Amino acid sequence: MEKTVLLLATVSLVKSDQICIGYHANNSTEQVDTIMEKNVTVTHAQDILERTHNGKLCDLNGVKPLILRDCSVAGWLLGNPMCDEFINVPEWSYIVEKASPANDLCYPGNFNDYEELKHLLSRINHFEKIQIIPKSSWSNHDASSGVSSACPYLGRSSFFRNVVWLIKKNSAYPTIKRSYNNTNQEDLLVLWGIHHPNDAAEQTKLYQNPTTYISVGTSTLNQRLVPEIATRPKVNGQSGRMEFFWTILKPNDAINFESNGNFIAPEYAYKIVKKGDSTIMKSELEYGNCNTKCQTPMGAINSSMPFHNIHPLTIGECPKYVKSNRLVLATGLRNTPQRERRRKKRGLFGAIAGFIEGGWQGMVDGWYGYHHSNEQGSGYAADKESTQKAIDGVTNKVNSIINKMNTQFEAVGREFNNLERRIENLNKKMEDGFLDVWTYNAELLVLMENERTLDFHDSNVKNLYDKVRLQLRDNAKELGNGCFEFYHKCDNECMESVKNGTYDYPQYSEEARLNREEISGVKLESMGTYQILSIYSTVASSLALAIMVAGLSLWMCSNGSLQCRICI
């Protein structure tokens, strides 16, 4: 009879109504890294590192780039005859120059402070070329014979279009005194130069005067140049050299020139009509007839991701450059949680619902929720409130990362002349160091955010579990796997009240108490039976052992093996 009662009680426990707390799971194989773990499979993840580009040069926000093709910046500004297509250029978004353009300074020489001029151009979007000293105004000097075979055009000798090489006229080179007043409202880029002959004979042949000079002055510039006559190897068929200079002439300022020979005078200057963000990119790409918001020397980027690893030099609304190969942000939950019977903490942030047995693929309309079973059936239901709060918490995670790294180090494509190579090497090391630190910060932040996100989800499951536990109290039993077994009947209406937090504990407490006591009574009665059996077994075993010892002693006494003495 006792066995029958115990069996019925056990069956009734198995079939009791239950409610379980769990979380969403799916077939995702996406993995993320955290501070504590690598390759954690999650239900949802977002790649935040852009790795692709289109391999083309594109318009930037509808404005075409100035692609110099085979011309250099110097060839364009001075007017190399092979760069006539760039005599007048419209507004540009950025400038593209090849690494080694063929049409540079056709007459050999150098451009003074060339790198600084390029840096200036990275803040300019439009030039307007204006004539400041007409070529026809040099009545006392030969302004037409200053050409060279080094600068050919249509098979004939020519020269830079925007400057004039002045030669003696009628065996005389009168001293030049010429001024230009900048009456424009914009700054003016003015260029001029000096010719360094090969020998004294060439000096007098071209300029008559054996000793010459060039003086240039503005409100901020005071320059005096003299030619350096020396024998040099031929470059482009020329033993002479030319050196070019530039300055920015402010509005209402004047530039004064004085020279008695070797002067390369400005004819045109560039009015800076629009300033803005620009850059000079070194690229061999061709124009792709496309539009973009972000351009790199490798191609255009069309992405909403916060980071990229394509090239450190960019222009436009671009993701931030890092050296990383992988940055994946967790937005969902662990998809393969540990299955444990006891609570366990892991991670850095908050409590972990490690006692939950596993995720539910059957729950598709939320991240966290319930599974119930009673006489009316069973089913899954998402907890809308906790799910929505979690969604709100991770929706702005990408923006949060950007805000935390809101000071981007910009790698600027600087150029250095031969005398500044050590500075260039130091600059490259500094840029590499900055990028290394920037990359480390980005990777560390993603790892920490992933750890925080996964712990955040686990904590939400734990909070949902505690919400149910505090409602049910002793009306249900905790099974240790995220489930509760009711001590009373709980129909669908009852289940719904548990889910929405309106469970009426007093309503079910009496039924739960009776069932709980009945189960406890069965256990106690069974325990008493087991105690009686245990005592009986112990006494019987002891008695049998005593009889065996007594019999053995009598046998040994009878055959003389043991002497027995009874003393009274």
From Swiss-Prot:
Glycans are attached at N26, N27, N39, N181, N302, N500. Palmitoylated. In natural infection, inactive HA is matured into HA1 and HA2 outside the cell by one or more trypsin-like, arginine-specific endoprotease secreted by the bronchial epithelial cells. One identified protease that may be involved in this process is secreted in lungs by club cells. Keywords: Clathrin- and caveolin-independent endocytosis of virus by host, Clathrin-mediated endocytosis of virus by host, Disulfide bond, Fusion of virus membrane with host endosomal membrane, Fusion of virus membrane with host membrane, Glycoprotein, Hemagglutinin, Host cell membrane, Host membrane, Host-virus interaction, Lipoprotein, Membrane, Palmitate, Signal, Transmembrane, Transmembrane helix, Viral attachment to host cell, Viral envelope protein, Viral penetration into host cytoplasm, Virion, Virus endocytosis by host, Virus entry into host cell. The keyword Mitochondrion does not apply. Residues 17-531 are extracellular. The record marks R346, G347 as: Cleavage. Pfam families: Hemagglutinin. One of its GO terms (biological process) is fusion of virus membrane with host plasma membrane. The keyword Nucleotidyltransferase does not apply. GO terms for cellular component: host cell plasma membrane; membrane; viral envelope; virion membrane. InterPro entries: Capsid_hemagglutn (IPR008980), Hemagglutn_HA1_a/b_dom_sf (IPR013828), Hemagglutn_influenz_A (IPR000149), Hemagglutn_influenz_A/B (IPR001364). The chain crosses the membrane at residues 532-552. Residues 553-568 are cytoplasmic. It comes from the Viruses. Disulfide bonds join C20-C483, C58-C290, C71-C83, C106-C151, C294-C318, C490-C494. A lipid is attached at C557, C564, C567 (S-palmitoyl cysteine). GO terms for molecular function: host cell surface receptor binding. HAMAP family: INFV_HEMA. Homotrimer of disulfide-linked HA1-HA2. This is Hemagglutinin. It comes from Influenza A virus (strain A/Hong Kong/156/1997 H5N1 genotype Gs/Gd). The gene is HA.
